[in-house]
Amino acid sequence: MPSLPWIFVCPSSRGIGFHLTRHLLQTTTLPILATTRSKDLEAAKQALLSGLQHQQQHDENPLAHRLTLTHLDVTHEPSIQQASLLAKSLFPPRTHHLHLSFAIPGILTPEKSPSQIDASSSLAMFQVNVAGPLLLAKHFVEFMPRKATIPDGDSLKKSRLPEHATWMFMSARVGSVTENKLGGWYSYRASKAGVNSVAKSLDLMLGVRSGRRALAVAYHPGTVKTDFSKEFWGSAQAGRGLLEVEDAVGKMVEVVRGLDMEKERGKCLDWRGEVVPP
């Protein structure tokens, strides 16, 4: 029996994750498990569905039936484990597989010089930006397809998705050691370089476990107009590109749709689909 695909987005309550979840609801037909740190899951779900086509009462809304919200804090492993148990009950591995996983938590405290480095802020960036995605992989990578998995082609065709599954980590161009010409942002740069390393290692594991059925990549979305990057919009306009969030998530999904299994697995790609050097 073909394996039914599903999507995981963590987190989904604000910024890129929020708009990505809404975009996936409208442009795919797959069920989505999305996460929020909020304990008010109903309010979080209503916010994600607000204004979308078919917005009606939950019992009549086909988009609502495809979306499940769960509490998850990437700094608290028990909440990640609980979310994985929910995933297992919603999408039994014998009949389902995780086809798109977006592990995209992130925080940023800029440091222009070593004197501005604060131990607690630095550790928090590593905890959220690197350890968080690692723990997501620990508890959710088991749902990715194996070599013998036969994905449901009809579901993927309707959603315009490739047959291989994708695990995507959120990185940033500043995580490239090769392209570091300006310095600064010591902790954030190091954390994103760590994300790129994690993506490579996970992809090597998937290559053994899943073969051509799954790959892992890191992703640089560009400078996106969210609260996360608000104080840096000016420098982006000066030459590095500034994307509206709806445009950014559309490009993100298009990069996923166009991934080259042979040339791009384990690498970091930007919003144009170009490889960011390590």
What are these regions (language model features)?
Residues V9-H23:
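N-terminal Rossmann NAD(P)H-binding glycine-rich loop of SDR-like oxidoreductase domains
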Residues T28-A44:
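Conserved glycine-rich Rossmann-like NAD(P)H-binding loop of the short-chain dehydrogenase/reductase
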Residues G51-P78:
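Rossmann-fold cofactor-recognition segment
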Residues L72-H96:
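Conserved Rossmann-fold cofactor-binding substructure of NAD(P)-dependent oxidoreductases
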Residues G106-L108, S113-F126, A131, V141-R213:
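Catalytic loop of short-chain dehydrogenase/reductase
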Residues T178, H220-W233:
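Short beta-loop-alpha junction of Rossmann-like oxidoreductase domains
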Residues E231-P278:
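C-terminal helical subdomain
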